[in-house]
Amino acid sequence: MRAITVCGLAAGAVLSACSFTALADEGLALNSGHEYMVTTNYPNNLHVIDLASDRLYKTCKMPDAFGPGTVQLSPDRKIAYVLNNHYADVYGVELDSCKQVFHASITQHPGEKARSMFAFTVSHDGKELYTVANPTLLLNDRYEVKEPRLDVYATDAGLDAKPVRSFPAPRQLTIMQSGDDGTLYVAGPDVYKVDVNTGQFTVLIPSRHWKRPNYSAPDVLYVWNQQTYRHDFSLLYTTAKFKDKQQDPATAEPLYGLFSVDLATGKTETTDFGPLTEIYFSGMRSPKDPNLMFGVLNRLAKYDIKQKKLLQAATLEHSYYCMSFNRAGSKIYLSGTFKDVAIFDADSMQQVGKITLPGGDMAITTAQVFVR
């Protein structure tokens, strides 16, 4: 067992010596009905945090190397699938036992080296896992960049999983989620819907190719593949809204916005939510009030979507890349970058806790919050 120091805060108070010890035991099974958070960090840890106590519950040791540490959960919340080993492999870890139950290499053919740039997820029924491979053929005198492919794996294939289907895919694909009807939604130059049986990609939300009058082309940097309580697939964009057809950049209004797909219905949304005053790496709507939008990087910010207005912003000890809500929407958990998870009250925007994890930085991990 490993002793972990966890420090909680009263709202509005400063960090103090209110620490206690939590024990992280690989053999601890998760409890039905309890809410947890999973995140990863160096050297190669998968952590489970109990959100009732905001304490580390257990730590699973992962094989091979860390990076990026992106986590996707099976629908029954029993298995965490992690893209790791420098973007080269996907591992499935049973959360109750820390046992590895799945492994797939992104590289599938002799002579190639392939990586997935955050592009993987689990199907809505948990039976399949999807990845986008970006292969390069390593020849004696040159490298050949090959066509990306969408690979489909059976999740019960064990530790040497091979694709059961493969299809050509567009370039520059990143995060993805599976809809309730089996449609795969993938972010790239546009947001696509994909038939995973035929490999057909169809533009669902134009991004690079949008035609919004008097708007500049949007800019999208979003690699945090979040499974949300709102059951949506969302990513942020920035754009400029011009005053007229002259499209003068000097008078344009810089804006932040949100692309979103409802995973239950497939309904899409392209919504500006506020002025662009700073950069956020990830953002999420409140589970209890869909009109409230939050974003994080160097500050934690809250917006009123209808009014397109910044309501509050909180100062952070350091940058955080990834944000998550608890199910009630009352607390926000900030992860990524260093080795601590910061906890904020969603209403007051005051820090109310901090969990320091064993090991090193979380870097560019994607954390997930769930109820078993």
Question: What does each model-identified segment do?
Answer:
Residues 8-17:
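Bacterial N-terminal signal peptides
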Residues 1-9:
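Bacterial N-terminal signal peptides that target proteins for export
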Residues 18-372:
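Predominantly soluble domains enriched in secretory-pathway, periplasmic, or organellar proteins
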